[in-house]
């Protein structure tokens, strides 16, 4: 009798622990797939980013707890790289494809498309989901030239309540 109760109690604890862990992962903001949210888009898209293009991007990188680990906005110096060439983390190569010059995106990047299980010590822990607020400044040296539409900067723009 005591062993049956002990077994039931153990099963209850295991079940409760699994439920708690699932809730904790969701609360921390971790994601398993790349999530792209368009925060702002120009009225017309004159220049769009494609694989092989050299792009300039302003960004702010954060952990899911809100800790900022890097920001070109604060430095006043956008980052330049060749899109799709592996010069940056995979989440950037995938998350900025198709963006228009002047477009602002929020990228939620899972560890597998970021710095993986090893992280990038000391600022980025292993297994970290990364959040980047990005603004595409130029594609192949072509800056924005079109009119911007009056989007709401505070609007998440995801179309997905999970973000």
Curated annotation (Swiss-Prot):
Residues 142-163 are annotated as: Disordered. Residues 1-25 form the signal peptide. The gene is FKBP15-2. Belongs to the FKBP-type PPIase family. Gene3D superfamilies: 3.10.50.40. It comes from the Eukaryota. This is Peptidyl-prolyl cis-trans isomerase FKBP15-2. It is an enzyme of class 5 (isomerase). InterPro entries: FKBP2/11 (IPR044609), PPIase_dom_sf (IPR046357), PPIase_FKBP_dom (IPR001179). PPIases accelerate the folding of proteins. It catalyzes the cis-trans isomerization of proline imidic peptide bonds in oligopeptides. One of its GO terms (biological process) is response to endoplasmic reticulum stress. Pfam families: FKBP_C. Residues 149-163 have a biased composition (Acidic residues). Its main location: endoplasmic reticulum. The lineage of its organism: Eukaryota, Viridiplantae, Streptophyta, Embryophyta, Tracheophyta. Keywords: Endoplasmic reticulum, Isomerase, Rotamase, Signal. GO terms for molecular function: peptidyl-prolyl cis-trans isomerase activity. It comes from Arabidopsis thaliana.
